[in-house]
Amino acid sequence: MIVINIKENEPIDKALKRFKKKFEKTGVLKALRARSYYEKKSVRLRKEVIRASYRLKLQEAASND
């Protein structure tokens, strides 16, 4: 359960923004979307390999700059 303490005289926009950040960090929505349909283990592993290679490319590009 996510708890946000609203400070005195704090605009609701800022409190809502903090709530959204905390909610995004927990990864609840991401997990919910991932479980919305069944995904075979081989497909999941293939996606992980693709993501890992993409991150590696980004790291190499950043180190070359």
UniProtKB/Swiss-Prot annotation:
GO biological process: one example: translation
Top-level division of the source organism's lineage: Bacteria
Record Gene3D superfamilies: Ribosomal protein S8
Coiled-coil annotated spans: none
A Pfam family per the record: Ribosomal_S21
Keyword Lipid metabolism: no
Keyword Transport carried by entry: no
Example of a GO MF term: structural constituent of ribosome
Keywords of this entry: Ribonucleoprotein, Ribosomal protein
GO cellular component, one term: ribosome
InterPro entries for the chain: Ribosomal_bS21, Ribosomal_bS21_CS, Ribosomal_bS21_sf
NCBIfam families cross-referenced by the UniProt entry: S21p (TIGR00030)
HAMAP family found in the cross-reference section: Ribosomal_bS21 (MF_00358)
Similarity-based family: Belongs to the bacterial ribosomal protein bS21 family.
Protein's recorded name: Small ribosomal subunit protein bS21
Organism: Cytophaga hutchinsonii (strain ATCC 33406 / DSM 1761 / CIP 103989 / NBRC 15051 / NCIMB 9469 / D465)
Lineage: Bacteria, Pseudomonadati, Bacteroidota, Cytophagia, Cytophagales
Gene: rpsU
